[in-house]
């Protein structure tokens, strides 16, 4: 629900009124920086399901394996079926990240930018590629209390760009999340890479920073070591019980 809260924290304006319009700008461009982790993929899934859908969603990453998994769980073809043009890009392979990200939008820029990694360079790129009336959300919470980055104040004045941060959500965000999951319009499973039983809970919690992948799902009613979902098929070839699970 905090992902939905992030989208709902963004706002835009219209020249003929002083009202603020809540949420992502319908029919425009969304950029999710560092978006191939579990929360970023949740943000992609929601972008394809929300009422005010964007025209284009661009997701950045610097790791090819994470990009490959992202394409597997939420493909460009699936997004197209939902009426959204989805792009996954490896910014580590770009000569000029800002120029190439803007090129995807034909120079227009991004109306809603989400920073899913608390890294100065990423935040500064987001600021540089905002469209007119763009809004950038620092979704990833930094641990450094003096974390800072440069912002183009000229654009804040003349292009009406905005920067905000969001953490968590409210009751209506939670209710919307539950409704979308119930209707199978979003797929929270894209965020999960490992599952385990209650006996794996303590060790997983203690070593969480050392375990790669996305979210870890613990089933309280079973006994099972923490296992990567992608390993199930291989395990099934070696063990009949695992084969039945697969």
Segments (PLM) and residue ranges:
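A glycine-rich, Thr/Ser-enriched phosphate-binding loop motif common to dinucleotide/cofactor-binding enzymes
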Residues: 1-14, 36-38
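Short helix-loop-beta connector
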Residues: 13-29, 108
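Glycine-centered, small-residue-biased loops immediately flanking beta-strands
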Residues: 55, 134-135
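Rossmann-fold NAD(P)-binding glycine/threonine-rich loop
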Residues: 140-160
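Adenosine-nucleotide cofactor-binding segment
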Residues: 33, 44-123
